[in-house]
């Protein structure tokens, strides 16, 4: 099988070029900063609908529901949520 060129630049030429890094350094920095702010501001919790760490258990329900028997788990969880 003969190896023919596809006419594309080799990957090593691309990543060692100055032009590549001039374009990608700001882009990578902006992506990192925006991802950090997305999580840090709590917007990720709002977008994905997950509770914030301080909202998992309210002041009325400070104990985790405990399941003792494997086959009665649904019944035990229903009782634990009914007591709220």
From Swiss-Prot:
Membrane topology: Single-pass membrane protein
Cofactor: heme b
Cofactor annotation comment: With its partner (PsbF) binds heme. PSII binds additional chlorophylls, carotenoids and specific lipids.
Function comment: This b-type cytochrome is tightly associated with the reaction center of photosystem II (PSII). PSII is a light-driven water:plastoquinone oxidoreductase that uses light energy to abstract electrons from H(2)O, generating O(2) and a proton gradient subsequently used for ATP formation. It consists of a core antenna complex that captures photons, and an electron transfer chain that converts photonic excitation into a charge separation.
One term of GO molecular function: iron ion binding
Major location (coarse): membrane
The organism of origin for this protein: Gloeobacter violaceus (strain ATCC 29082 / PCC 7421)
Transmembrane parts of this sequence: 22-36
Protein name: Cytochrome b559 subunit alpha
The UniProt record lists the keyword Heme: yes
GO cellular component terms given for this protein: photosystem II; plasma membrane
Entry similarity comment: Belongs to the PsbE/PsbF family.
Matches recorded under Gene3D superfamilies: Photosystem II cytochrome b559, alpha subunit
Keyword annotations: Cell inner membrane, Cell membrane, Electron transport, Heme, Iron, Membrane, Metal-binding, Photosynthesis, Photosystem II, Transmembrane, Transmembrane helix, Transport
Location(s) in or outside the cell: Cell inner membrane
InterPro entries xref list: PSII_cyt_b559_asu, PSII_cyt_b559_asu_sf, PSII_cyt_b559_N, PSII_cytb559_asu_lum
Lineage of the organism: Bacteria, Bacillati, Cyanobacteriota, Cyanophyceae, Gloeobacterales
Key word Metal-binding present: yes
Pfam families: Cytochrom_B559, Cytochrom_B559a
Domain of life: Bacteria
Amino-acid positions noted as binding heme in the UniProt annotation, renumbered to this chain: 24
Subunit structure comment from the entry: Heterodimer of an alpha subunit and a beta subunit. PSII is composed of 1 copy each of membrane proteins PsbA, PsbB, PsbC, PsbD, PsbE, PsbF, PsbH, PsbI, PsbJ, PsbK, PsbL, PsbM, PsbT, PsbX, Psb30/Ycf12, peripheral proteins PsbO, CyanoQ (PsbQ), PsbU, PsbV and a large number of cofactors. It forms dimeric complexes.
Any one GO biological process: photosynthetic electron transport chain
